[in-house]
Design a protein with these regions (language model features):
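Inter-helix linker motif
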Residues: 245-264
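Acidic/histidine-rich catalytic cores and adjacent linkers
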Residues: 52, 57, 61-64, 222-225, ...
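Conserved phosphate-handling catalytic cores of large alpha/beta enzymes
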Residues: 263-275
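Short, positively charged, Gly/Tyr-enriched micro-motifs
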Residues: 75-173, 179-184, 222-225
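Short helix/loop capping segments that flank catalytic or ligand/cofactor-binding pockets
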Residues: 53, 106, 137, 185, ...
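Mobile genetic element proteins and their domesticated derivatives, centered on retroelements
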Residues: 43-44, 58, 98, 138, ...
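Short, conserved DNA-binding cores of transcription-related domains
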Residues: 1-103, 109
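RNase H-like nuclease fold core
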Residues: 150-238, 245, 450-453, 457, ...
């Protein structure tokens, strides 16, 4: 268990210098001195020292070596001419037992992250490439296996390092938190809105009270005046707990977004007979923004799909009515009038199924009526840029190929520069302009899809998720 695997005579100064990792010494077993140049066996610099290891728990030096475990990493040697030399780095890590507090501990290292199969310098290169390409494509370029267990680790490390280099976040007066779904996973998006400027603040890994609480802990809570929320119970509870003095609102944008989702459910159900180009996007647009060609496509479709026609006509009437003064009873009344729209769209004697998809909107309005009324009482509503920003983010997420959260998070937070602001001589970051963010996200999607179509890039994830 505690037997030493190497003797000091096997230390290779040249290979240690080539490896250039301050913590490690390269040693060579007799059978790999000349034949296995791509394999570097290493030990900690203290391996041949007679000094006792210090227990990290009680600081005692009354410790003894218990075992040695070999850990294999992929690494890339530093090069002045840009040449890539990828090696197998095998680190023989020692474990110790403290005779005082009885804890077992290992040699502490910082050349690689816990749970990652790449050294930090290689993982940083892989993470940088994965910001704009698929992880598998980048790993293939470097000639290393695409470790599924490591991708999250390397992207989290890259994001953490980059954010740590930025100035602190300036807490915005107005927050917008909405909960989009990316391949069936809910990833809350946090925006700030200041006049007509909408900026991305962060993306959270899940919609839970604990996730929100962690994010809110980084804000100056007294500075937040208004928070626009989605009808999400976890979000609702977390916001009221963290910001008891702020105004909590549900905006017109949010209500219309959920109504569009209900219309989308109808479109999906009636979709076998719907021949409209980009049907979800086109059928959800206000009629005044439709081209003549789109109007003809919709007209032909509605003549065949009478249930969809009832939902579509009702939706268009609602958009017109909400351009004026509206309130919760008015929208609930619109939902109650849906059977009349079905009757107007049905042929004589035709019995169409009720539009139960919109019952969800009624539930939302009844549960969150105080937050909607708080919004309606505002003297100045949020700029139209908010609705455009949310729609642009949803569209870009819908088009982006599947990736795990850590990749998506890094792509959204690191590909566009954060805007900065100086307050009382101190520099702060204020977020990422959403228009630049979505433009970059769409560029990344185009790059990935183009390479797939050309057969240059094949991305197979561990799961086979899809939109729901």
């Amino acid at each position: 268990m505690g037997r030493r695997l190497f003797q000091e005579v096997y230390v290779s100064p040249d290979r240690t210098k080539a490896l250039d990792l301050s913590e490690l010494i390269v040693v060579s077993e007799r059978d790999d001195l000349e034949t296995k140049n791509a394999i570097y066996h290493t030990v900690h610099r203290s391996y041949f020292s007679k000094e006792k290891a210090v227990c990290p728990y009680c600081k005692s030096t009354n410790t003894s070596e218990t075992k040695i475990r070999s850990r294999k990493y992929k690494d890339i040697l530093p090069s002045k001419n840009g040449e890539r030399t990828v090696i197998d780095l095998i680190y023989h890590q020692r474990y110790f037992r403290c005779d005082e507090c009885k804890h077992v501990f290992n040699e502490d290292i910082d050349f690689a992250e816990e749970g990652c199969r790449y050294t930090n310098r290689l993982s940083d290169l892989l993470a940088e490439g994965t910001l704009t390409q698929t992880y598998e494509k980048v790993c293939k370029e470097y000639g290393v296996p695409a470790s599924k267990t490591s991708v999250g680790v390397i992207m989290r490390r890259r994001l953490r390092m980059k954010i740590d280099q930025l100035p602190p976040l300036k807490t915005p007066d107005n927050l917008v938190i909405f909960v989009p779904y990316f391949y069936s996973n809910a990833y809350p998006v946090v925006l700030s809105i200041n006049g007509g400027a909408v900026r991305l603040i962060d993306v959270l890994s899940e919609s839970s009270e604990s996730a929100y609480a962690v994010f809110f802990s980084g804000l100056e809570r007294t500075r937040v005046k208004r928070i626009y929320i989605d009808p999400d119970e976890q979000l609702h509870n977390a916001v009221y707990t963290a910001f008891p003095d702020a105004s909590i609102l549900m905006s017109e944008e949010c209500i219309l977004r959920y109504i569009r989702e209900c219309l989308g459910d109808v479109i999906k159900r009636e979709g076998t007979r719907c021949f409209v180009y980009k049907r979800y996007h086109t059928l959800c647009k206000a009629e005044k923004y439709l081209s003549r060609s789109e109007q003809k496509q919709i007209e032909r479709t509605l003549n065949r799909c009478h249930r969809l026609a009832g939902a579509y006509n009702a939706y268009q009437d609602l958009l017109v009515s909400m351009e004026g003064k509206w309130d919760v009873p008015k929208i609930i009344g619109w939902i109650e009038d849906l059977p009349e729209y079905l009757g107007d769209s049905a042929n004589e004697g035709e019995d169409l199924e009720e539009l139960i998809e919109f019952d969800f909107v009624r539930d939302i309005l009844e549960l969150y009526e105080p937050q909607v009324n708080e919004y309606l009482a505002l003297d100045q509503k949020p700029a139209a840029a908010l609705a455009s920003a949310v729609m642009a983010i949803l569209d870009s997420l819908h088009e982006m190929p599947f990736c795990i959260f850590d990749v998506l998070h890094a792509r959204m937070m690191l590909n566009v520069d954060h805007e900065l602001e100086i307050v009382d001589g101190k520099k702060y970051r204020t977020g990422i302009p959403v228009n630049l963010l979505t433009e970059k996200m769409n560029d990344i999607t185009d790059i990935i899809k183009t390479k797939k179509e050309k057969g240059e890039d094949v991305y197979e994830s561990e799961d086979k998720p899809g939109w729901s």
